Amino acid sequence: QLWGQGRRMGELAGAVANVQIRKLPDVIAHMRASKARIKEILGSPPGVSFRRLNDPDGDTGPFLILQFADEGQAHRCVEELTRRGVRAVFRLVEYGLHIYHNIRSLVRKQSLSPAGNPWSLPQNAESVHDYARGACPQSDSLFERSIIITIPSRLTAVQENALGEAVRESVGSRSAQH
């Protein structure tokens, strides 16, 4: 007999998930509130914009993305935030998630479909099939000059203020601007 078989492990996993799912609305509300307070502390820093949200009501608030005029400013801001003790900050291009050239199955054109869709479809025969870094220069530029700051699910007001002030000061510091 395999470990866990006959031990109702599926029921245990379901019971734990059921309890965790009930907590989800509070966790999301807290992250949204933390993100809103941090954005309020930041105000409207010159030369920096917030990522446009196409569905603000659907944003759960797990991170804050700031967009700079150039890659150097983003890099310097991450360095300054790290120097100030903020560890959960990255240039978006280095974060790794959900960026086309980091999705191996997309770059390699590996399909879940046995038919190889969409790459093997006759309708796509004329399409350019390159998803390596550099295939989308406008997106690449955006990724390179954006930073992502993760928002933990249970920040206290003191932590929100400290993070907000560190970001505000780092964005406004001469080292981040030049």
Regions found by a protein language model. Name each.
Residues 1-178:
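PLP-dependent aminotransferase class I/II
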